[in-house]
A protein has these predicted regions:
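Hydrophobic transmembrane-helix bundles of small-molecule transporters
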Residues: 155-248
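Extracellular/lumenal inter-transmembrane loop segments of multi-pass membrane transporters
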Residues: 31-42, 93, 154-158, 213-216
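Primarily residues marking transmembrane-helix entry/exit sites
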Residues: 1-12, 94, 201, 241
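Extracytoplasmic
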Residues: 3-61, 111, 146
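Hydrophobic core positions of alpha-helical segments in small-molecule transporters
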Residues: 25, 45-49, 76, 99-100, ...
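Hydrophobic residues within membrane-embedded alpha-helical segments of Major Facilitator Superfamily
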Residues: 13, 17, 24, 29, ...
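Helix-loop-helix hairpins in multi-pass membrane proteins, especially solute transporters
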Residues: 58-195
Length: 248
């Protein structure tokens, strides 16, 4: 298979399992809540935690790929996502599920941007549009298949299998990445640690504030306080980035 087809399909494997998992869990929330003995609204914390992990770790994904290489970073990202999936499938409490979803988010935060970086750096510009089309179509199938698949599994099986079906596809993605994705190792710029912390805190608090307002995850006062603190953190990051020679 040609390179401009193979690489996008490998990356699309990771995007597929991430997008499918994110949408499939939504239809299983009542069943999960029943197993854990909590209100379904409390499980929105598991959804929010995943988004928080994405917001925190996506900004640093490019630096990690430059520092350690695109291939190992992509493979480890899928592995971390699979570990989170196993944690979700074996969770026996809301706290365990939230922690596992955060681990999934860490892996997902590296999979998506690093995978696209591989395509941009490995394929000639003349073939780039065609390559991205091979990436987009399979990746879009995940959100389409997620809800009906999640409902089917929850109705006729157990909601835990929603996370376990990620394992064979993820292992396939790791194998294909090991065989075909180039290393793409380059000399990274110094990591902007302060910028990373400011952006992580700002994005996490802002997203948590928006996600919590009106959803009864926490009190309205706490949600509003997180939102304001997050906006302040992002403002501090902008000021910091303007002065830093190598901003995040």
């Amino acid at each position: 298979m040609k390179r401009e087809r193979l690489l996008p399909l490998i990356v699309a494997t990771a995007l597929f399992i991430e997008n499918m998992d994110s949408t499939a869990i939504a239809t299983s929330l009542p069943a999960i809540a029943l197993d854990f003995g909590v209100e379904p609204v409390a499980l929105k914390l598991a959804l929010t935690t995943y988004m928080l992990a994405l917001a925190v770790f996506i900004p640093v994904s490019g630096w990690v790929a430059d520092r350690f290489g695109a291939r190992p970073t992509f493979m480890v990202a899928i592995g971390v996502f699979l570990l989170g999936s196993i944690g979700c499938a074996s969770a026996d409490s809301l706290g365990a599920l939230v922690a596992a979803r955060f681990l999934q988010g860490m892996g997902g935060a590296m999979m998506v941007p690093v995978g696209r970086l591989v395509i941009l750096r490995s394929i000639a510009k003349a073939q780039l549009v065609r390559a991205l089309s091979w990436l987009t179509v399979p990746a879009l199938l995940g959100p389409m298949m997620g809800p009906p698949l999640g409902g089917l599994i929850t109705t006729y099986g157990n909601w835990r299998y929603i996370f376990l079906i990620n394992i064979p596809m993820g292992l396939l993605g790791i194998f294909l990445a090991w065989r075909h994705i180039p290393l793409l190792l380059s000399e990274p710029k110094p990591l902007d640690v302060r910028g990373f912390l400011l952006s992580a805190i700002g994005l996490a608090l802002t997203m948590f504030g928006f996600a919590s307002l009106g959803r009864h995850l926490v009190s309205t006062e706490l949600a509003a306080g997180c939102l304001l603190a997050g906006i302040a953190g992002l403002a501090l990051y902008v000021l910091h980035a303007r002065r830093h020679p190598h901003p995040l």
